[in-house]
Amino acid sequence: ITCLHWFYLHILSECGLAPLNNRIVGGEAAPPGSWPWQVSLHTFAHICGGSLINDQWVLTAAHCVSWLGSTPFLTVYLGRQNQSESNPNEVSRTVTRIIIHPGYNIPRFNNDIALLKMSEPVVFSNYISPVCLAAFNSTFNIGEDAWVTGWGNIGYDEPLPSPGKLLEVDAEIVGTHQCKCDYSKIDDDVITDNMICAGFREGGKGPCFGDSGGPLVSQQGDRWILAGVVSFGVGCNAPNFPSVYARVSQFESWIKSHITRNRPGFLTFVSNNTEDVLNSSCTTPALTPAINISEGQEPRKLIGYMLGFVNNCQDLDKIYCHFVYKECKQNEMLFLLLSNLNQQQLSNENEHFRL
């Protein structure tokens, strides 16, 4: 017990510190060492992000790894700054174990979280260190500042240009009630208590393809705390549809049940911003909705409307039928992406939706 307690205090003293981070400007390349917990997950190329949470475990999105048949195909890169040039502070590890949350729901992205155990521990440095995790009693209220990082696309059809530098962008927490209102245009049951939303009403800033599994962090004092794991959204940051993340604080017990040695550091984030009022009315968007669903028509309960920001197949042909359909033959993966669809279009094209 004494040893385990010492290990926990050790991680708690290390987590969430980024001495090379001087605050950031949204949409810019991140200086080396700014986000030392950021990892890049590779099969044959970068597919997703993730967060280092202790010396041997990474937290990512379940949809990033649920399709993998075995761990040898997956490599974790830590201390990486760019995807196509040398990275002097980088180390890599293979993955020996993948643990997907048992409640992960493939069509609906609920409980979209997974743990990866690396082949051996890493040594912490200014460029490689763990992030703190939001404890179960954390509160992230409306308008709280947050930051998202990753190597994903810079636009819907715009891959990250060479040399593929790690990008950072600011975001604001969106209340769960408002987020449910926004996504009710698609389905009343999209947003659950296991999710946290962030973004801006006007859209245009946030995660895109290739950013899945990466961190949404907020700063408290000198510590950065992981609030969410990039999960899904509509298009790439469509107006009036905030990006959706797995809410890390909901999974404290599950994470602790699988990591019994050198446990991650959990800290309670206390927000001073406006509390989410569940019985308030929905804010009517001032901007044109990104989805055109005819009045009186009930949308199908298919979360294939939306996209998980995974980047498994970058060279796929796109078929535009008022929605975008992508099929990845490698790994037999199917991704359904949204672009201005309605009930009648779904009825006509339903045969394409096979998850």
Residue ranges and their predicted role:
Residues 18-25, 38-42, 144, 149-306, ...:
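Extracellular trypsin-like serine protease catalytic domains
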Residues 36-55, 108-109:
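A conserved glycine-rich beta-strand in the N-terminal activation segment of trypsin-fold
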Residues 17-21, 58-61, 66-106, 176-184:
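Conserved H-D interstitial segment of serine endopeptidase catalytic domains
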Residues 58-62, 110-135:
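Conserved active-site neighborhood of the chymotrypsin/trypsin-like protease fold
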Residues 102-105, 121-168:
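Active-site substrate-binding loop(s) of clan PA
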Residues 1-13, 76, 337:
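Cleavable N-terminal signal peptides of Sec/SRP-targeted secreted and luminal proteins
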Residues 296-334, 339-343:
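Mature extracellular/luminal domains of secreted and GPI-anchored eukaryotic proteins, especially small
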